[in-house]
Amino acid sequence: IPTLVMQIQKCSKLYTAECKMHKIVTHDDKVSLHGKFMETDYNIDLPVGSRKVAIPMDATIKAYIDFSSFSEASILRNGDKLNVVLPDPKVQLTSTSINHEEVKQFVALTRSRFTDEELTNYEQQGRKAIIADIPQTNIVEQARESAARILIPMFVQMGFKEADITVSFRKDFNKNNIGLL
């Protein structure tokens, strides 16, 4: 078992799944007058024109298994049977890119163009939206399957039969708790 632990700990972080996402962040900016007059709320769009922007974003999300806390307690051997309990996959947004040539703006003549600060703010909102959409992907399940496909051959090389090896994880995730990764 110590040899197994040492072999697995050599991996440190094992990146097992990657997901590419494309998102178009849009914003519609109208000038309006809000207020209250004689206890009546009003909201009037002013005819000075509107501004619209569409920002295409590409993002890369990666899932990995962090073996820094992996120990002998994670491996249970019962005769020829081997049960390996792996740490839960972790998910991170590793990169985002914006094709600036594809950014589209519509600005009425009576309005000013979007400032760099406004565009940066919309890009940040896009990144947050991508992170919020991670639970809809199946990247955690892909990471688990890939980790098993990578580790089982290592155990087979050490003399175990593939049919006697069970790889499991600590926790089952659903869309309500996947954001905790």
Regions found by a protein language model. Give the residues of each.
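Domain-level marker for long, solvent-exposed, non-transmembrane regions
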Residues: 1-181
